[in-house]
Amino acid sequence: MDKKVFRSSTRPAPPRFSKNSPRGYPPRGYMERLAKQVLWAESDGGSWYKHLMNPAPIPSGAPVIVAQAPCRADLAGGTIDLWPLYLFHAGAVTLNFAVNIVTTCRITPLKGKRIYFHSVDTHKDEEFADLEALRTGKRFRHPLAARMVQFFAPKEGFLLETDSESPAGAGISGSSALMIATTAALARFTDRNLTLEQMRVIAQNVEAQIIGVPTGCQDYYPALYGGISSIHLDADGIHREAVPIAPEEIESRFVLAYTGAPRKSGINNWEVFKAHIDGNKRVFRNFERIAEIAGAMHQALLRSDWEGVARLLREEWKLRRTNAPGITTPLIDKLIAVAGKNGGRAAKVCGAGGGGCVIFLTEKGASSRVATAIGENGGRVLPLQVARNGLRYASA
């Protein structure tokens, strides 16, 4: 990139996202201003922008497609949702709830065959002359979009934009939620009438292709359905049950905090997965207990037995630390200790751990005190609101 050209004050101001627009949606006129940028680049030698998008994408006039899906916080039974681990533990179940931290996929149909990718949150851009050029690619700046498009194989050109409100490496399933949003948007764009379960299978399998290790199933259900879920992992399939708890009960008792440390969920899960499959008896026994804890926590939630939920959450965290010592960090240990002195009853990392987010269960009425203590000791408290609904299509 020619830095002198990039810093030129003569080029038009680049199109920006409006603070008043829904997150991830370009304001009206975005594509037109983008075209002006390319025209300037062609006339004034702005090679950096010519490389970014040349020729300028021209909307076809077909409707823009926008799909959104929420992230999640997991309570119990994680990692056991990896196939075939749950088949070795009778009655395996995993518990989680959707949080109103949203991912978005937006598809703008274009004239011609060119394909453009733009990630709003990671600032990554990529383009291809046509589908065949994308199919022959080996490495991608936006692998999620690229792999999904390879699967759906749309015939026409388009601009695919993604955005996620989740912090990087948070462990709240931002990537899986975005997989669901992208699956839904591309299915609609290619006129594929998929059920929610078909979307789950596609998203889970393509994500495994991207990260190169097995993926669990639990992350996709909050993105699809929202609410509080008990996901039963049986030999005849996976079955999602809505847990009938008022969302306000969850919101008043839990705090979600980001530790700022990125994590490698595939690596952490893969190490535990291998140990289980290799016959590590200690890991097997721990998973037996994790399955029992998840089942017991499901019943405790149904009874609104929050003391029981706290006890089980503490026990699950202890077992997870035994299975994978790298699941915690000094900051996580510090925040859990600080929370315990201010009304926190239990805590665990979200996802595979090694950093990212921690979910804290507090005494009734103590959530604000716990949140303040976490913020004063290096954690970043995220807004915690249960997403009442899962996947939805929004107007452009």
Annotate each PLM feature:
Residues F6, P14-A76, I80-W83, L87-F88, ...:
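C-terminal nucleotide
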Residues E126-A133, F158-A168:
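Glycine/charged-rich beta-loop-alpha catalytic/anionic-binding loops adjacent to active sites
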Residues E161, A185, L382:
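General small-molecule cofactor/ligand-binding pocket signal
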Residues S166-A170, R345-A347:
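Short pre-catalytic strand/loop immediately N-terminal to key active-site residues, enriched for Gly-Thr
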Residues I172-R192, L196:
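DPxDG-like acidic metal-binding loop motif
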Residues G355-C357:
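Glycine-rich active-site/cofactor-binding loop and its immediate structural neighborhood
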